[in-house]
């Protein structure tokens, strides 16, 4: 079943799509406007997979998104099985494609907001061409991959299809492909 995600109730509708994917073969498709609401999407996505290793691959990343990532890296949850507090996002690979004019400002902001986590080895920042937007997160129990076409904020708003996958196999494939960029396109901040 394909649905259209409305800005008014983003998290609620995404949770519904996640439930559909988990019940219906591991995949759910939905439509949304070309701009992702990252300040709502990222907390929902990573909160659905606590203790995850994750990849964020976006063409354009603004200061607000960097701030949201910093907030997520600082969040913790209580792991009942281990009996301890752990970070919601254990390790993050961030892949972006800044324009030449924005690259220096983006690097400074990434360093300012995420420098602590970069120094700890929990965040790896890469710059490379990005063919599609992708979020991937997995924690051994739950695995999510959200894919869509590239950011198109310079265009008129239009609906685009996105795919939410809950299979471990899809997560492994996405992580292998995107992790390789973490090794070859890593930048020092």
Where in this protein do the model-derived segments appear?
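N-terminal localization/anchoring segments of enzymes in phospholipid and broader phosphate metabolism
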Residues: 1-51, 71-82, 143, 152, ...
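Primarily the HKD phosphodiesterase
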Residues: 40-119
